[in-house]
């Protein structure tokens, strides 16, 4: 059996005391019906769509307003990949997405700043 040096136990205790417990945030979800107004090709491929109806999963969720135009890159239903462009809807089509976002603190250039991680997965028809 290997013995650890005597100084390793206090170090481990000190490290545990200084590490704050990780806190998981909750994804905020909004069910949105959209009308595709444009399939943008340059500079970055994305969809532009007008919000027809938006239903938050809970009262505290911030959904885009009805009538607003949003731009996004469509994702697969599991949020794991961008939807292949051949499966993107065309201009004029009505679609449904389950918009998800997570607010948090991002780090960059040594400065922390508030940020939002967003996902735009399609809902199976």
Regions found by a protein language model. Give the residues of each.
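Bacterial N-terminal signal peptides that target proteins for export
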Residues: 1-11
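Cleavable N-terminal signal peptides
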Residues: 11-12, 22
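N-terminal signal peptide c-region/cleavage motif recognized by signal peptidases
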Residues: 17-21
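Structural detector for short beta-strands of small beta-barrel domains
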Residues: 26-58
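OB-fold/S1-family single-stranded nucleic acid-binding modules
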Residues: 51, 103-125
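Short, cysteine-centered beta-strand-loop-beta hairpins and adjacent loop/turn segments enriched
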Residues: 54-64, 104-106
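Beta-strand/loop nucleic-acid-binding surfaces
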Residues: 60-86
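Short nucleic-acid-contacting surface segments enriched for D/E, G, S/T with interspersed K/R
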Residues: 80-98
């Amino acid at each position: 059996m290997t013995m650890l040096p005597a100084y390793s136990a206090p170090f481990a205790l000190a490290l545990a005391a200084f590490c704050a417990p990780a806190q998981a945030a909750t994804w905020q979800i909004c069910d949105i019906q959209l009308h595709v107004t444009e399939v943008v090709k340059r500079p970055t491929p994305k969809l532009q769509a007008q919000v027809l109806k938006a239903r938050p999963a809970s009262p505290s969720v911030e959904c885009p307003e009805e009538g607003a135009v949003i731009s996004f890159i469509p994702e697969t239903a599991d949020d794991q990949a961008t939807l292949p462009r051949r499966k993107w809807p065309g201009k004029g089509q009505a679609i449904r997405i389950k918009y998800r976002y997570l607010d948090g603190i991002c780090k960059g250039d040594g400065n922390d700043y508030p940020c939002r991680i967003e996902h735009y997965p399609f809902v199976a028809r």
